[in-house]
C-alpha cells in the first residue's frame, strides 16, 4: 500500500438502513423523518494506491467489498462498501454529496426526507450512467 493511505472514518445517521431498492439492487433508506440540511453520511480516508500498485499485484482488493475512486492521475482510493455506496441515482434527489475530493464522501439531506424514503443523489453523467431507473417524473432519460 501507498504511504499516502489514510485512516478510514465512517459515520452514518442511525436513521438509515440498507434495503432492497426499486431503483437498483440495494439502497439506503430513512427509518424516520430527516430534516433538510442534516448530515446523512460521512466517510473520510481510505486505502490509497497507484495504478502501478494495482497492475503489479501489490494491492489486491475484492471488488465486491470496496468502492474505488480516482483522486489524481494514476492515484486511487478505496473504502469498504457501506451506506455511501448504496445511495442510488435519481434525477430528483433528496440528498447531495458535498465532497470536493475523492478522499471524502459527505451526503447531506437536500430537502426533507420522509420515513421509508430511499436516499438518492444526482450523479448523472452520460459517460458512466448508461441507464436511469429513478422512476421520477423529472427523469432526464425519459423521452
Which residues are covered by each model-predicted region?
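Catalytic cores of histone-lysine modification enzymes
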Residues: 2-96
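C-terminal SET catalytic tail plus cysteine-rich post-SET Zn-binding segment of SAM-dependent SET-domain
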Residues: 91-143
Amino acid at each position: 500500500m501507498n504511504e499516502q493511505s489514510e485512516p478510514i472514518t465512517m459515520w452514518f445517521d442511525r436513521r438509515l438502513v440498507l434495503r432492497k431498492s426499486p431503483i437498483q439492487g440495494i439502497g439506503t433508506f430513512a427509518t424516520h423523518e430527516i430534516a433538510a440540511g442534516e448530515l446523512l453520511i460521512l466517510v473520510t480516508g481510505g486505502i490509497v494506491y497507484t495504478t502501478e500498485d494495482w497492475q503489479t499485484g501489490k494491492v489486491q482488493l475484492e471488488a465486491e467489498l470496496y468502492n474505488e475512486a480516482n483522486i489524481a492521475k494514476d492515484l486511487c482510493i478505496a473504502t469498504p462498501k457501506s451506506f455511501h455506496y448504496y445511495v442510488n441515482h435519481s434525477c430528483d434527489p433528496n440528498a447531495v454529496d458535498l465532497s470536493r475530493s475523492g478522499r471524502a464522501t459527505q451526503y447531506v439531506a437536500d430537502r426533507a426526507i420522509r420515513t421509508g424514503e430511499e436516499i438518492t443523489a444526482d450523479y448523472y453523467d452520460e459517460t458512466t450512467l448508461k441507464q436511469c431507473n429513478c422512476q421520477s417524473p423529472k427523469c432526464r432519460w425519459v423521452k
